């Protein structure tokens, strides 16, 4: 293992980033930019497939303009392929990060994120999640169970609103 400056952290970010479009991807890219500006080392990891294409009829889940100011993320995680969940978890663990930060907004991602978080924590890696939605606005069967499966696997939760904090309390966190 290489020696590192105690004040500078190695932070892995997991979630949608370039080439994916949308506010969540933009948020993670800006978060990475801010961390880099403060001298931290970042390792961004994103999806090979975020959603099945059938969920995007007539439009794309990718940005039209391929330009980004963030580092190119490693595209490892396929939300529909559990083998990539293990591969991503192993890869993140080998990076020896100080912390892995997930971006969470819907229970669809909970199985993959939950498995990865548990794998990392068993290896002594801290896991923190920025939570946009702890519970969906229109709940479906399994949303509560899936959400708690992932969120309970985290060392820390960062909320973006009082409403989300209330939802976490409702879930017993």
Task: Give residue spans per PLM region.
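A short, active-site helix/loop in glycosyltransferases that binds the activated sugar's phosphate group
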Residues: 154-173
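Nucleotide-activated donor-dependent transferases that construct or modify glycoconjugates
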Residues: 7-21, 100-101
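N-terminal strand-loop element at the rim of the active site
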Residues: 15-21, 32-94, 164
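Helix N-cap/beta->alpha junction signal
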Residues: 104, 133, 161-162
């Amino acid at each position: 293992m290489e020696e590192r400056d105690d004040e500078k952290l190695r932070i892995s970010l997991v979630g949608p980033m370039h080439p994916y479009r949308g506010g969540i991807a933009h948020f993670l890219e800006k978060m990475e930019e801010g961390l880099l500006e403060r001298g931290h080392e970042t390792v961004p990891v994103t999806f090979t497939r975020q959603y099945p294409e059938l969920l995007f009829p007539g439009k794309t889940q990718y940005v039209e303009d391929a330009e980004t100011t963030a580092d190119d993320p490693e595209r490892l995680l396929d939300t529909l392929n559990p083998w990539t969940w293990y591969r991503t978890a192993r890869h993140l663990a080998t990076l020896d990060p100080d912390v892995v930060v997930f971006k969470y907004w819907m229970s669809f991602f909970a199985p993959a994120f939950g498995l990865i978080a548990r794998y990392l924590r068993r290896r002594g890696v801290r896991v923190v999640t920025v939570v946009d939605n702890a519970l969906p606005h229109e709940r479906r069967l399994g949303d509560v169970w899936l959400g708690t499966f992932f969120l309970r696997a985290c060392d820390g939760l960062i909320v973006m609103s009082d409403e989300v904090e209330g939802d976490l309390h409702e879930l017993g966190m």
